[in-house]
Amino acid sequence: AASSFSSCLDEEPLYSQNNTVVFSSDSGAELALLGCYAYMTSTSAYGQHFQEIPVSGAGFSWSQRNGSDGIVSLQSLSSDGLISTTWNGMYKVISETNAFLENLDASGLSAETKNQFGGEAKFLRALAYYNLVSLWGDVPLKTVASTSEGISMPRTPKEQVLGQVVQDLNDALTIKETSDAGRINSWAVKAFLGKVYYKMVKLGINTNENLKNAKDMFDAVYNKHVYELEKNFADLFGDWVTTSKESIF
């Protein structure tokens, strides 16, 4: 007679790092969130290429293969390596935060955890979209995890994209303070929200209202005295420096 050993099999391979396992605990979800932070510090984002674009555009960089010529002459193409990798780098952050937020929302974690981790992820998504709008204007807007059907999307008007940025940042205002200097906090959210409002003023979007909004946010941060200038400017550039009282994020 045939024997069945189905009862001996693991139906849920708990050693496998799938979404169900990762988002079953605060520590697992936090590791996934730190992965989103890591993509923002990658070579194709703040780790190198995003920083190189304004430097190259100002004429302060040099490439043996004339790699910066297009940017310096303000005639860069989408095929330029620095341009394409920066675009892809920011959308990688967006893709990962979209997936993170969907899995976090579907998890059984506490409302407090969802608010904290979700707020941090939304800040990262907002930052990525702000950078994209600053460089390219109208860009595709995606707030859900990527699927094969959604790979190719038309550009979304920058006004709508910035509206999503403001919404994400407002959602992030309620996050708690953290002792980790590399993590976002509510004061950094307010500072950046003020910057976004002022960007909208410069673009002619609800000028009077957004000018007041920007001032309110900047005043709140300034009056709290959370940040201040370094007494010695050179201290910002030492190879031992990992953070600074000037650093907002």
Where would I find each of the regions flagged by the language model?
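Conserved beta-strand positions that form and line the central face of beta-propeller blades
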Residues: V22, P140, S152
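Intrinsically disordered, low-complexity boundary segments flanking structured domains
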Residues: F23-D26, L127-A128, N232-W240
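Acidic, glycine-rich segments characteristic of secretory precursors and extracytoplasmic regions
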Residues: S4-P54, G89, A99, E159, ...
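Aromatic-residue-lined binding/catalytic grooves and analogous aromatic/hydrophobic interfacial grooves
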Residues: C8-P13, A45-L74, N98-E102, S134-P140, ...
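Bacterial Sec-type N-terminal signal peptides, specifically the leucine/valine-rich hydrophobic h-region
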Residues: A2-F5, Y129
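Short linear capping/connector segments at secondary-structure termini
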Residues: Q17-N19, Q75-S78, T143-G150
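Conserved, well-structured interaction surfaces
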Residues: E30, L34, A38-M40, N66-W136, ...
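Short, mixed-charge aromatic SLiMs
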Residues: S148-P157, A220-E228
